[in-house]
Amino acid sequence: KSVLGAVNLVNTKISKKLIGANIHDQTRIDTILINLDGTRQKTSLGANAILAVSMAAKKLSAKIKRVSLYKTFLVKNNYRLPYPLMNIINGGAHANNGLRIQEFMIRPDKAKSFSEAMRICFVVIDNLRKLIIKKGLSTSVGDEGGFAPMISSNEKALDLVVAAINKSGFKNGKDVSICLDVAANEL
C-alpha cells in the first residue's frame, strides 16, 4: 500500500474501529487491527497503516502515562542481569590451534546472582589455566578471549573443560554447563 493510501485507511476504516478502545490496552488495539485486515500477510490494510497505528497508540499511551516509551514495554520491575556464557577455549576461525569447534563456553547454572556467576566462571577459568600449564601447553588467547592451546581434538578440549569444572568443586551439567558454538557455517 502507498503511504497516502495508508493515511486514507487510517482516517476512514481504521479510526472508526478504534473509537472507544482503551489506549493502554495495546494487545486489544493490535487485535482490532489484525482482525480488521483479515489477511495472513496483512495485505488488506498493509503494514504501513497497521504498524503506524500500533506505534502511534503505544506512543500516545506512554505520553498519557507520562513515562518514557521504553518503560511501557516493561512487564515487571524485578530486573536482573542475565547469566554469562563465558568463552574459555577458542578454536575454529578464532584461533590457529586446529580445533574445529569455534567456542567452548561455560554457563554458571548454580549461581544465584550475576556476581556469583562471574566468580564461578573465574574460578573455572583459573583452574583451566592451571591444567593447561600442567600439560605444558600455551595459555595464549584466541580472538574471542578464550585460551587457544594446541590441542589435538575437540574431545580433548572438552575433557579439559570438564576437568577444570571438577577441579573447581562444581558438577558438570548441574552447577556449571558446557556450551558450544560450533560455527557450522565454518565447517
Range-by-range predicted roles:
Residues Q41-A62, Y83-L99, D143-F147, V182:
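Conserved phosphate/anionic-ligand binding catalytic regions in large, soluble enzymes, centered on
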Residues R66-L85:
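Glycine/threonine-rich beta-strand-loop-alpha-helix active-site module
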Residues Y79-G142:
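Mobile "lid/hinge" segments at catalytic clefts and subdomain interfaces of large enzymes
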Residues R40-N48, F104-R119, G145-S152:
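Flexible, glycine/proline-enriched loop segments at strand-loop-helix junctions
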Residues E155-L187:
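Catalytic core of soluble alpha/beta enzymes
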Residues K1-K63, V67, M118:
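Metal- or metallocofactor-binding catalytic centers and their adjacent structured scaffolds
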Residues I23-I29, A47, L69-T72, R129-F147, ...:
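Flexible, glycine/charged-enriched surface loops at secondary-structure junctions
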